[in-house]
Amino acid sequence: MMVPVRCFTCGNVVGEHWEEFKARTREAEEPEDPEKVLDELGVERHCCRRMLVSHKDLVDIVSPYQ
Amino acid sequence: MTQDYEVEFVERGEREARILVRGITPAFANGIRRAMVADVPTFSIDTVRVIENTSVMFNEQIGLRLGLVPLTTDLDDFEIGDEVTLSLSVDGPSTAYSSDLVSSDPMVEAADDNIPIIDLKEGQRLEVEADAVLDTGREHAKHQGGVAVGYRHLQQVEVVGDLGEFEDDDPNILRGVIEEQAAEHAAGDATNGELVATDEFDNDLRNRYPGKDVEVSDVPNAFVFHVETDGSFTTEELVLRAVETLRDRATELKDAVQL
């Protein structure tokens, strides 16, 4: 629903990078390459990278059904 | 067992460092690693009193997310079991961030400001009061100060000859840190005894020693630790505190078995 605060595997904090990652790779008019964005954000390990790459925000989808 | 040991920084940063330690046994290296993960305490939210939660998430889910937010910890001023109260109050439409946590003690606050806790829509509201407690990673993973702490042997590369002209040109991948022993064959500037992280030559020994046949071996009793923290304290603090807990336990054992 919301982005996980930490990487499930190693415990590194990944939540703080989510909004920038989302803005640059999915919402920008010219989306950047996620690989490059993750490198620039300093998310190095592939366990942490998959946390951001595979995430989808669901709050907007769930909220009408409260 | 008394043996001389030596500590050297390969890379040094606030949150990430690589440290070379010589003259310790593999068992002791693992002891330090385990102490860094399990025995250095950090503050983490443990109890949450929900005053109002009309968000799309359950109280328990909010509690879990708050528990995972790293909090700055000064280990000189607190003891295991100490509590600090934090509060969070956000009205929708907006997002509650870790920076919205208001602490009763300025020394304990969120280490990262941009962690989204929950997205609130129009008319939704989150108000909680939370107690952060100082405890060790042994008790719960949220109290771990060290993240992805590990070590490798320091490695040395020996040039054993030239590659044949028609030999297979396969990559020769190596990770970790090498101690330069064959500077005369290395590409670029190199001096013997220098510590080189393998990512400097893209982890491929062909780039470092072009056209040479090489053999890699471990340097005995030398370990390169990779230490990363979640922001609760610096890497230096983490390593020193870990070694201190080991020393305390060794002293305790020595006193206990003395006649």
UniProtKB/Swiss-Prot annotation, chain A:
Domain of life where this protein originates: Archaea
Reactions this protein catalyses: RNA(n) + a ribonucleoside 5'-triphosphate = RNA(n+1) + diphosphate
Leading EC class: transferase
**Which Gene Ontology BP terms does the record give?**
DNA-templated transcription
* Localization, UniProt: Cytoplasm
Which cofactors are named for this entry? Zn(2+)
Can you list the GO cellular component terms from the UniProt entry?
cytoplasm; DNA-directed RNA polymerase complex
Alphabetized GO MF terms: DNA binding; DNA-directed RNA polymerase activity; zinc ion binding
Signal sequence region? none
| Residues reported to bind Zn(2+) | 7, 10, 47-48
SUPFAM superfamilies noted in UniProt = RNA polymerase subunit RPB10
* Cofactor note text: Binds 1 zinc ion.
What's one Pfam family the UniProt record gives for this protein? RNA_pol_N
Give the EC number(s) under which this enzyme is classified: 2.7.7.6
Q: Main role?
A: DNA-dependent RNA polymerase (RNAP) catalyzes the transcription of DNA into RNA using the four ribonucleoside triphosphates as substrates.
Assembly and partners? Part of the RNA polymerase complex.
Query: Cross-referenced NCBIfam families, in alphabetical order?
Result: PRK04016.1
Q: What is this protein called?
A: DNA-directed RNA polymerase subunit Rpo10
Q: Which organism is it from?
A: Haloarcula marismortui (strain ATCC 43049 / DSM 3752 / JCM 8966 / VKM B-1809) (Halobacterium marismortui)
Question: In the UniProt record, what gene is named as encoding this protein?
Answer: rpo10
From Swiss-Prot, chain B:
Presence of the UniProt keyword Transcription in the record = yes
Coiled coil (UniProt feature): none
Would I find Coiled coil among this entry's keywords? no
Q: Which InterPro entries match?
A: DNA-dir_RNA_pol_30-40kDasu_CS (IPR001514), DNA-dir_RNA_pol_insert (IPR011262), DNA-dir_RNA_pol_RpoA/D/Rpb3 (IPR011263), RBP11-like (IPR036603), RNAP_Rpo3/Rpb3/RPAC1 (IPR022842), RNApol_insert_sf (IPR036643), Rpo3/RPB3_RNA_Pol_subunit (IPR050518)
Pfam families with a match to the protein in the record: RNA_pol_A_bac, RNA_pol_L
One annotated Gene Ontology cellular component of this protein: cytoplasm
**Compartments reported by the entry:** Cytoplasm
Query: Signal peptide location in the record?
Result: none
- Top-rank taxon of the source lineage equals Archaea
One GO process term, biological-process aspect: DNA-templated transcription
Q: Which reaction does it catalyse?
A: RNA(n) + a ribonucleoside 5'-triphosphate = RNA(n+1) + diphosphate
Q: What class of enzyme is it?
A: transferase
Binding partners and assembly: Part of the RNA polymerase complex.
Please report which protein family the annotation says this sequence is part of.
Answer: Belongs to the archaeal Rpo3/eukaryotic RPB3 RNA polymerase subunit family.
Q: Which PANTHER family does the record cross-reference, listed alphabetically?
A: DNA-DIRECTED RNA POLYMERASE (PTHR11800), DNA-DIRECTED RNA POLYMERASE II SUBUNIT RPB3 (PTHR11800:SF2)
What is the purpose of this protein?
DNA-dependent RNA polymerase (RNAP) catalyzes the transcription of DNA into RNA using the four ribonucleoside triphosphates as substrates.
Name of this chain's protein: DNA-directed RNA polymerase subunit Rpo3
Its source organism is: Haloarcula marismortui (strain ATCC 43049 / DSM 3752 / JCM 8966 / VKM B-1809) (Halobacterium marismortui)
The gene designation is rpo3
